[in-house]
Amino acid sequence: MIFTTPIMTLYKSFYLLIVFLLGISLNIYAQSIQQIETELKQHLTRIDHFAYLSLKTEASAFDSLLSENIILEEKLIQYIKKNPEMLSYEFSQLKNENFSVATSPDRKFRIFSWDQRTGGSMHFYDNVFAYQINKETFAYSPTLPEGNPGGYYSDIYQLKDEKETFYLGYQHRVLSNRDQFQCIQVFNIEKGTLNEQYKKILTKSGYTATLGFSFNFFSVVDKKERPIRLF
């Protein structure tokens, strides 16, 4: 979900009219996975372009930045629903485009994440969750609480208990140049849908679906690993 304030929600309602018209053309013209990758890269390039212009206080550039984020989100969702390859293709062209793809080992669950470039030192991220049930692919963008900047997922780990398979998503949030946050979020696929709140982590207060902590980035900046993983 892109928008975390009421004003931004109004932007999405307006631009979704445009995206709806775009969606009609997507239903008509099939594309290869390579063509889809090229198209997604073009939108990411435009996001960078309008983010740069918006820093120069060009109001119209910020509107265009919001629009590009919405279109990218909606295109991803539509392409995933139509093309099962979206859960396994490597998307090597997008690796250096502020775009992250985390995939479960069984390739039945994938999270696409990108920096919307709408913030300053605090980064706001969008995600699209994609999963497969009986060879049918599903996708949606999760809803975030108002004011939550979201984060990107670098990894998905797969575990199995005596009953079922479940997944651990490794999320990173950039709250400022110094302050960052990491968490593990537990997912499972049940009753034909993705459960974002699968409570498998035992804490002193009971079972929870997420476990995370804040830290000072400058205290670990010397680590060579990127992204830094502290769990």
Describe the residue ranges of each PLM region.
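Bacterial Sec-dependent N-terminal signal peptides
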Residues: 1-42
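Start-of-domain marker
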Residues: 31-109
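Trp- and S/T/G-rich repeat-edge/linker motifs of beta-rich repeat architectures
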Residues: 83, 136-143, 148
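Short beta-strand elements that form the blades of beta-propeller/WD-repeat-like
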Residues: 108-115, 165-173
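Short glycine/acidic-enriched loop and turn motifs that connect beta-strands
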Residues: 117-120, 174-177
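Beta-propeller blade signature
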Residues: 125-133, 183-191
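Beta-strand initiation motifs
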Residues: 136-139, 193-198
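Short aromatic loop motif centered on NTY/YTY
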Residues: 148, 152-162, 171-175, 195-231
